[in-house]
Amino acid sequence: MGGDDTAKGRQLQMEVAENKIGSLHYLSKAHTFLTSAWELASKAEVLDLVENLIGPDILLYNVTYIIKEPNSLSHVSWHQDLTYWGLSHDDQVSMWMALSPATKESGCMRMIPRSHKQGRQKHEVTTDKTNVLLQGQTVTSVDEDTAVFCPLNPGQATFHHGWTLHASMPNISSERRIGLNVQYLATHTHQTKH
């Protein structure tokens, strides 16, 4: 998706922007004010993959940076993205691109393979202050023995459906773990809940 040098350059651009406007962690619609986020989200090779998954009529729904600071207890609990968005259809795919190394130590993503085929799972409210998931919910009925780690080098990406169960552990490394999270929808999809 661009390689290590490109990812490091994009990470530097993101950090320069952070110095000017503050934290970009989970700041919605980053592609509307950062050229580098737009360029990564709209790369031809990325859009070709997205087209193979949801068809040729693609809407760039959202772009956020997911940042875990070093030596942090922050984690993301098991969840499904589509639970929160109130969309008419589930023709959706998310790309998570590493801008820094995403290792087990730095809290790379974990997924439950084929879990998207089970549809929506029950989410429960959590009061865990170290859970950085904005909605504060978690799926508790997850068989973690079936989870796979998704380590990535800078510039590599994973793609997952919005019903895929996924989570990530704390970053116990000495470096920031930075990823670009991009959601794509088929254009026939519309918002049904706000």
What are these model-predicted stretches?
Residues 9-15, 157-159, 163-194:
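Non-heme Fe(II)/2-oxoglutarate
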Residues 9-14, 80, 129-146, 174-176, ...:
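Short, surface-exposed loop/helix-turn segments at secondary-structure junctions
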Residues 33, 61, 91, 105-107, ...:
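Residues that flank catalytic or metal-binding motifs in active/ligand-binding sites
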Residues 65-72, 82-83, 90-91, 99-104, ...:
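Short acidic/polar capping segments at secondary-structure boundaries
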Residues 35-42, 88, 144-153, 173:
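Aromatic-acidic/polar surface patches that form glycan- and anion
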Residues 1-78, 83-87, 124:
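Non-heme Fe(II)-dependent double-stranded beta-helix
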